[in-house]
């Protein structure tokens, strides 16, 4: 059985919580783009599943470069997909980054400039996907890192007619209970707007939701993302976080992070 955490590669130097990172595993923005090892985990999953060129939905793509969780799949393996980003300037830069990468050819990209939420029909992930993919219901990878409505958008996706083999979702490392920010909390656009911890959902809440729909938690790229695989495709290949322990996902934060972010204790929704 494979422990996927052993395959984490792609760490932003001086901006990850892992103190000792081998040089070949550091994010160099050519081989790796992720922040805390996500690139290596995804690479190993799709190697074992024998998916050489897949299709993704990338919710919260930023500039498709700095700490991107799909760029390596695109540039190295030629993946296709849908990029979703509310910041139009960031999305434009992302398009330029792809256009200037000589490794990318024969790919099919779609770009959507808008929010992801369940508050308006034009922001629902199922409606957005339907605007770009007709008849296609299963994707190889869904990523959601939007610093706001992760729980609600993931629930909307899973309860609809779309599915994914692998899901990467951003979580809130500061919460240990099974809680989420409410569906109508103020969204945060870009890292500069994250001045408190009132966003996304805790790892236990997201794990509970994913398990309900047949997904297993196979990697925690602490303190940013959880990676799940549909149990149909796991079949005992990858070690599962069962039971999920607080030490696996919780991070107390460093001085820089805690100074920038107010700790919000009220308003969380218990799941």
Enumerate the language-model features and the residues they cover:
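Membrane-proximal basic amphipathic "stem/tether" segments
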Residues: 1-27, 271
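N-terminal, active-site-proximal structural segment of metallo-dependent hydrolase catalytic domains
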Residues: 7-13, 17, 31-34, 174, ...
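Short glycine/proline- and acidic residue-enriched helix-loop micro-motifs
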Residues: 24-28, 190-193
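SAM cofactor-binding core of SAM-dependent methyltransferases
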Residues: 29-128, 141, 173-176, 252-259
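Hydrophobic, Leu/Ile/Phe/Ala-enriched alpha-helical segments that form helix-helix packing faces
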Residues: 45-46, 98, 129-133, 206, ...
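Helix N-cap/coil-helix junction residues
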Residues: 51, 103-104, 134-136, 162
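Conserved acidic-Pro-Pro-aromatic motif
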Residues: 55-58, 72, 79-80, 137-144, ...
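Short amphipathic alpha-helix with an adjacent loop that forms part of the alpha/beta core around
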Residues: 121-136, 156-160
């Amino acid at each position: 059985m494979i422990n996927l955490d052993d395959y984490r590669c792609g760490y932003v130097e001086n901006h990850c919580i892992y103190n000792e990172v081998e040089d070949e595993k550091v994010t160099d923005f050519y081989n790796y783009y992720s922040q805390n090892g996500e690139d290596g985990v995804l690479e190993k999953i799709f190697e074992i599943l024998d998916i050489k060129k897949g299709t993704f939905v990338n919710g919260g793509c930023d500039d498709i470069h700095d700490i991107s969780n799909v760029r390596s799949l695109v540039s190295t393996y030629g993946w296709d997909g849908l990029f979703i980003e509310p910041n139009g300037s960031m999305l434009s830069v992302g398009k330029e980054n792809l256009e200037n990468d000589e490794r990318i050819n024969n790919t099919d990209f779609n770009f959507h400039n808008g929010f992801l939420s369940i508050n308006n029909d034009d922001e629902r992930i199922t409606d957005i996907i339907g605007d770009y993919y007709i008849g296609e219901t299963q994707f190889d990878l869904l990523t959601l890192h939007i610093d706001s409505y992760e729980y609600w958008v993931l629930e909307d996706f899973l309860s609809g007619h779309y599915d994914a083999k692998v899901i990467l979702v951003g979580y809130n490392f500061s919460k240990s209970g099974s809680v989420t920010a409410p569906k109508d909390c103020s969204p945060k656009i870009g890292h500069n707007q994250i001045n408190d911890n009132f966003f996304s959902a805790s790892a236990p809440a997201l794990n509970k939701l994913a398990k309900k729909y047949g997904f297993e938690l196979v990697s925690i790229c602490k303190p940013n993302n959880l990676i799940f695989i549909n149990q149909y495709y796991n079949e005992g290949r990858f070690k599962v976080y069962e039971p999920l322990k607080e030490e696996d996902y919780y991070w107390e934060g460093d001085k820089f992070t805690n100074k920038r972010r107010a700790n919000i204790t009220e308003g969380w929704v218990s799941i």
